[in-house]
Amino acid sequence: EQTGADSTVRTDVCIIGSGVGGSLAASRLAEAGRGVVVLEEGPFRTPADFSFDENAALPDLYADAGMRSTDDLKFSILQGRCAGGGSTVNWMVMLRTPDYVLEEWRSRHGSEDMGPAQMRDVFNRFEREWNVGPVAAHAHSRANRILLDGCRALGWRAESANVNARECMRAGMCGLGCPYDAKQTAVKTHLARALERGARLYSETRAEHIARNRAAWTVRARSSSG
């Protein structure tokens, strides 16, 4: 959706960004019966819109056409700027937070509800919803097979990464969006469920100002059409 000039939309919850985090929140809140609005600065694209043309895809799907960096220019940041956010343009590797990291967070920051035991069910549910599983052995390239065999010959632990895909065509251009509709993105999973339950998505709409008054929060946003 897009709003007209100077229009007002009322809702229970306004979520800024439609990537993995925003879409998950939208889905859970919509399932709970809340009114949800999702603002997305970038465009809404379908598999039919994707191609392997980097000149077209980078400015369309990435923040700063894929050239975003930290202020000191030490790190580049490949940040999705489209419906689905990074899930639309990432390479699908789905890693669980290691237990030792969760334990460190708990000991340092008191995150008692995010220990390994509690997060196991969270990871399991998310992976079911996103169809996460290991890359099949036959799907590896020759280079990958050599690397796996070499690691195992040295006695090192080596496993196929888990990915979120159905019937992956192994085109090798995941960073430009999946024209085969195999990648299980936020658009296909949590955002789709949120929209089915009445959430509203405003694409090409940038949140510019957030203010709080006595009754509620106000978000001022601007669409690409002004």
Question: Where are the language model's segments positioned?
Answer:
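N-terminal glycine-rich phosphate/pyrophosphate-binding loop and immediately adjacent elements
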Residues: 1-105, 111, 116, 221
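A conserved beta-strand/loop element that lines the FAD pocket in flavoprotein oxidoreductases
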Residues: 195-207
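Conserved beta-strand-loop-beta-strand element in the redox core of flavoprotein oxidoreductases
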Residues: 209-226
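Anion (oxyanion) recognition and catalysis
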Residues: 30, 152, 195
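Rossmann-like flavin
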Residues: 80-170
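Cysteine-cluster motifs in flexible loop/terminal segments that predominantly coordinate metals
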Residues: 166-189
